[in-house]
């Protein structure tokens, strides 16, 4: 999940929402996208292939060990970090899942957990982890307003605002053990193990 999960999610939609046919973020005709987005995906795919060609060229010119050391290993670390943060923000036993009939934007935006990763990481990541609820409500808001927005969101949401200061390794363990699936029946469902 932490190293190859993100690339496999993009490539074959592993662990993603079920779609008819071949679900891939690289397939411009996939049900993930609207018809008017086909050319956007094609242009993006060209960029991905150009990047892969550049990596192949660098591997040929500099050697595969150099590319492994300076590109692939850091890439896997970034994937690990991205998936860890995203998983912990969106997967918690206290968060309900709303089915299509009862879901709305406000409920969906509130279905995330602000987590404290400590002063240094919060600062280096522009508080995306401890102000993530604000990001869901105002995704285009500059990061330097996120802490102020979070203070107001806490007041507005009251008991529906979710913050967890559990140490990250323990939060990961708890979510991994208790958040295995959601029931197939019901409009509002919670994680089960």
Show the residue positions of the predicted features:
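Extended interaction regions within the primary functional domain
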Residues: 68, 79, 110-112, 116, ...
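A generic hydrophobic-helix recognition signal that picks specific residues
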Residues: 38, 56, 83, 123, ...
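Short hydrophobic/aromatic segments of transmembrane alpha-helices and their interfaces
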Residues: 50, 76-77, 129
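Non-catalytic, topology-defining segments of multipass membrane proteins
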Residues: 1-73, 144-193
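Cytosolic juxtamembrane regulatory segments of multi-pass membrane proteins
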Residues: 104-123
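Transmembrane alpha-helical segments that form the membrane-embedded catalytic/substrate-channel core
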Residues: 6-18, 72-101, 106-110
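C-terminal, well-structured subdomains that either form a transmembrane helix-short loop-helix hairpin
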Residues: 122-156
């Amino acid at each position: 999940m932490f190293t190859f999960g993100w690339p496999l999610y993009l490539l074959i939609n592993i662990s993603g929402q079920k779609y008819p046919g071949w679900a891939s973020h690289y397939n411009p005709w996939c049900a993930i996208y609207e018809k008017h987005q086909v050319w956007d995906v094609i242009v993006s795919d060209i960029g991905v292939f150009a990047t892969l060609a550049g990596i192949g060229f660098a591997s040929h010119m500099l050697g595969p060990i150099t590319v492994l050391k300076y590109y692939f290993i850091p890439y896997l670390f970034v994937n690990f970090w991205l998936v860890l943060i995203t998983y912990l923000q969106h997967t918690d036993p206290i968060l309900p899942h709303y089915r299509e009939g009862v879901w709305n934007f406000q409920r969906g935006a509130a279905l995330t957990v602000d987590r404290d990763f400590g002063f240094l990481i919060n600062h280096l990541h522009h508080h995306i982890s401890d102000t993530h609820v604000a990001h869901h409500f105002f995704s285009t808001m500059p990061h330097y307003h996120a802490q102020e927005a979070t203070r107001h969101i806490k007041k507005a949401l009251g008991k529906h605002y979710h913050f967890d200061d559990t140490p990250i390794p323990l939060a990961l363990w708890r979510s991994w053990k208790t958040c295995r699936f959601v029931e197939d029946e019901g409009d509002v469902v919670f994680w089960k193990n």
